[in-house]
Amino acid sequence: FDIMGLIKKVAGAL
């Protein structure tokens, strides 16, 4: 599970 990848995806969606 890519935690950093998920965070970056959410940050980019904001």
Swiss-Prot record:
The modification Leucine amide is found at L14. GO terms for cellular component: extracellular region; membrane; other organism cell membrane. The keyword Iron does not apply. GO terms for molecular function: toxin activity. The keyword Membrane applies. It comes from the Eukaryota. Keywords: Amidation, Antibiotic, Antimicrobial, Cytolysis, Fungicide, G-protein coupled receptor impairing toxin, Immunity, Innate immunity, Mast cell degranulation, Membrane, Secreted, Target cell membrane, Target membrane, Toxin. Belongs to the MCD family. Mastoparan subfamily. Linear cationic alpha-helical peptide with antimicrobial activities against both Gram-positive and Gram-negative strains and against the yeast C.albicans. Shows moderate mast cell degranulation and leishmanicidal activities. Has a very low hemolytic activity. Its mast cell degranulation activity may be related to the activation of G-protein coupled receptors in mast cells as well as interaction with other proteins located in cell endosomal membranes in the mast cells. This is Eumenine mastoparan-ER.
